[in-house]
From Swiss-Prot:
Pathway: Purine metabolism; IMP biosynthesis via de novo pathway; 5-amino-1-(5-phospho-D-ribosyl)imidazole from N(2)-formyl-N(1)-(5-phospho-D-ribosyl)glycinamide: step 1/2. The keyword S-adenosyl-L-methionine does not apply. Pfam families: GATase_5. This is Phosphoribosylformylglycinamidine synthase subunit PurQ. The keyword Signal does not apply. Part of the phosphoribosylformylglycinamidine synthase complex involved in the purines biosynthetic pathway. Catalyzes the ATP-dependent conversion of formylglycinamide ribonucleotide (FGAR) and glutamine to yield formylglycinamidine ribonucleotide (FGAM) and glutamate. The FGAM synthase complex is composed of three subunits. PurQ produces an ammonia molecule by converting glutamine to glutamate. PurL transfers the ammonia molecule to FGAR to form FGAM in an ATP-dependent manner. Its EC number is 6.3.5.3, 3.5.1.2. PROSITE patterns: GATASE_TYPE_1. GO terms for biological process: 'de novo' IMP biosynthetic process. GO terms for cellular component: cytoplasm. One of its GO terms (molecular function) is ATP binding.
Length: 221
């Protein structure tokens, strides 16, 4: 299993993501700089981490979505390679058109940083297969622009297609229909604002995020 973490100027969760991937696979991921035009040969899994890429200038994720490496990420996603975007990575995926919708300023206009309860809406995807349908899990969030928005038709479509992966249970940021994570139509791209990589060790508060990586990386015990 070869994994890769995309690193942008301003990424600050890339090392956390690398630790999560290495914990599950036993191998350190390739850390791929945003200026690269290709991924390491044989890359099986791609992660776009949290942070403040390019200082969140213009819009969160807008400049990163136009980085050279994103073309290779999009091509890999089109071939079915799993792609996980967390927090700023989710913002990048929406800006790049790999996921529907947009992430706006939190409804309360405050940075939210705490562990929140989520409901698993779709337990059939490659990312969520280790969870039960309707299961409640606890995952940390840390964001200012996590308010998910899409027009009503798009929301109805992704709901009807089972593409809402996770939903907030306590109205964290004003997201439409409390959506916390969204899948692409093929199910191999997941964007989510909560940070599963920060929930892989009991010493750090819980392991509810670990199962996402175990399922996605195909090594679930």
């Amino acid at each position: 299993m070869k994994t890769a973490v995309i690193v942008f100027p301003g990424s600050n969760c890339d090392r956390d993501m690398a630790v999560a991937l290495e914990t599950v696979t036993g191998k350190a991921p390739a850390m791929v700089w945003h200026r690269e035009t290709g991924l390491p040969e044989g890359t099986d899994f791609i992660a776009l981490p949290g942070g403040f890429s390019y200082g969140d200038y213009l819009r969160s994720g807008a400049m990163a979505a136009r980085s050279p490496i994103l073309r290779a990420v999009a091509e890999a996603a089109g071939r079915g390679v799993p792609v996980l975007g967390v927090c700023n990575g989710f913002q990048v995926l929406t800006e790049a058109g790999l996921l529907p919708g947009a992430l706006m300023r939190n409804a309360g206009l405050n940075f939210v940083c705490r562990t929140v309860p989520l409901k698993v809406e779709n337990s059939q995807s490659l990312f969520t297969a280790a969870y039960g349908a309707g299961e409640e899990i606890a995952i940390p969030v840390a964001h200012h622009d996590g308010n998910y928005f899409a027009d009503a038709d798009t929301l109805d479509r992704i709901e009807g297609e089972g593409r809402v992966a996770f939903r907030y249970l306590d109205g964290v940021n004003g997201s439409a229909r409390d959506i916390a994570g969204v899948l692409n139509d093929a199910g191999n791209v997941l964007g989510m604002m909560p940070h599963p990589e920060r929930a892989i060790d009991r010493a750090h508060g819980g392991t509810d995020g670990l199962r996402l990586f175990e399922a996605a990386l195909g090594v679930l015990a």
